[in-house]
Amino acid sequence: MYRPEKNSIRKVTMQREDLIQSMFAPPEAPPVRWRIAPAPVDYQEAVETMEREAADIAAGTADELVWLVEHPPLYTAGTSANAADLVIPDRFPVFATGRGGEYTYHGPGQRVVYVMLDLKRRRQDVRAFVAALESVIIATLDSMNVKGERREDRVGVWVRRPEKPPLMDGTVAEDKIAAIGIRLRRWVSFHGLSLNVDPDLEHFDGIVPCGIRGHGVTSLVDLGLPVMMADVDIRLREAFEMVFGPTRSETNGIGTARLESE
């Protein structure tokens, strides 16, 4: 799920799992800023911040940034969103967004990771970048003894649920635990990924998540892991550094919105 700007797609026929090579910046590049918002962030404020930061990174006036946030309950519609997939349109606010993909949910208990990296200094390959983001999630889950998997026909990270009834075709049921939706402008990424830590999974009922029917959603707590967001953040950072290289802490996270659930 991505929306690159014009002329930014390279034709690649390899599977995503085969695309993982080096996504490190050159050795002389400064570490990526790692920012954690101290309070919930209004979605429109987040978009404006990403737009500004991505422009500064492209201009060479700011270092790359990873920004971890939570949002109040809301739905976002990507550039491929089908109106029929918004099942309960008045449940939460709905935001049209420039990222690729379809409908998704953000809310309390979900870690949203906005990734603003300059792929010109890393690797100008959109599919490889998406695969690298999946690898960050998979490594994060692996550190908690959860096996996350990618699927070639579905972007994101999935967890098998053998304890659930099998699918109609007899295969093992599987739920989505993390979603990815990105956009590129001048080869700088923004938007990013979301990992379900302990959101209210019933809030996903208002949409067909990512336009994919027949599969459910899950979270770390739903899988039986009583984890805290701060613990997940540490593991996310370690996994990110394995894939993309060093980071440095930044403390001026932005957060103003209130977390309000139905």
Swiss-Prot record:
The record marks 176 as: Lowers pKa of active site Cys. It catalyses: octanoyl-[ACP] + L-lysyl-[protein] = N(6)-octanoyl-L-lysyl-[protein] + holo-[ACP] + H(+). NCBIfam families: lipB, PRK14341.1, PRK14345.1. In the reaction, the free carboxyl group of octanoic acid is attached via an amide linkage to the epsilon-amino group of a specific lysine residue of lipoyl domains of lipoate-dependent enzymes. Coiled coil: none annotated. Gene3D superfamilies: Bira Bifunctional Protein, Domain 2 (3.30.930.10). This is Octanoyltransferase. Its EC number is 2.3.1.181. Keywords: Acyltransferase, Cytoplasm, Transferase. CDD domains: LipB. It is an enzyme of class 2 (transferase). Belongs to the LipB family. Its main location: cytoplasm. The active site is at 210 (acyl-thioester intermediate). GO terms for cellular component: cytoplasm. PROSITE patterns: BPL_LPL_CATALYTIC, LIPB. Pathway: Protein modification; protein lipoylation via endogenous pathway; protein N(6)-(lipoyl)lysine from octanoyl-[acyl-carrier-protein]: step 1/2. Residues 60-248 form the BPL/LPL catalytic domain. It is found in: Cytoplasm. InterPro entries: aa-tRNA-synth_II/BPL/LPL (IPR045864), BPL_LPL_catalytic (IPR004143), Octanoyltransferase (IPR000544), Octanoyltransferase_CS (IPR020605). Transmembrane segments: none annotated. Disulfide bonds: none annotated.
